[in-house]
Amino acid sequence: MKEVTVVCTSCNRPDLLEKTLDSFFKYNTYQLSEFHIIDDSGVVGCNDYLKEKFPSVNFWYNEVNLGQVKSIDKMYGYVTTPYVFHIEEDWEFYKEGFIEACLDVIDLDEKIICVWTRDPNDTPHPTIDPTYDINGRGVRRLMWGFDGHWHGFTFNPSLKKIKDWNGYAQIGRELEISKYYYEKGYFAMIFTDGYCRHAGWGRHVTDKGE
């Protein structure tokens, strides 16, 4: 079995985090190696009340705000598995089998940088033909150059290969990371029938890197 670690970023929104974890564990059907949550708000302990409810999760805190990308680098440095399933604290999963589905796709091409699990109707990012049938699931490639600078790389819920990571902070923000991988020929895939939707509308937290 392919080993997968989950890394989740949060920023002192424990109500959203709890809902995200509730839905994740309700619909996840894959055996995980580890599950890490890193909170970057600087409010140490803000998520501690969730420890009893989710005993398999490792809760980490930055004592001072580092920014999302540096927090991700910090957690990825602890990942020892070939794959990392990356999520944030404001998502709702609603269908089983999302990690298995991603694993069926991620290694089909060395240039697949990530496989999205987001409902395609929940994102404005367009896809391009053709639609591939992978074990009965429709999969499409995300378009390069959406809105001039988005090429598919995302911190939205998605599976990534840890070997493709060598430190994000040295590249820049999410937008700049997307450009970096695009220039190296990488692309992303998304399912025609998704597995999760964004649940944090109107609750955006300004990142230190913005």
What are these regions, as identified by a protein language model?
Residues I37-N47:
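A conserved acidic beta->alpha catalytic loop
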Residues E96-C114:
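Conserved donor-nucleotide/metal-binding helix-loop-beta segment in metal-dependent transferases, i.e.
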Residues N62-Y78:
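Glycine-rich, basic loop-to-helix element that forms the pyrophosphate-binding segment
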Residues I113-D129:
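Short beta-strand-to-loop element that shapes/binds the nucleotide-sugar donor at the catalytic cleft/hinge
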Residues V139-R141, W150-E210:
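C-terminal catalytic/acceptor-binding lobe
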Residues S23-L32:
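Short, acidic, metal-binding catalytic loop of nucleotide-sugar glycosyltransferases
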Residues M1-D22:
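N-proximal low-complexity "stem/linker" segments adjacent to membrane-targeting elements
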Residues P82-E92:
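Short beta-strand-to-loop acidic/aromatic patch adjacent to the donor-nucleotide binding site
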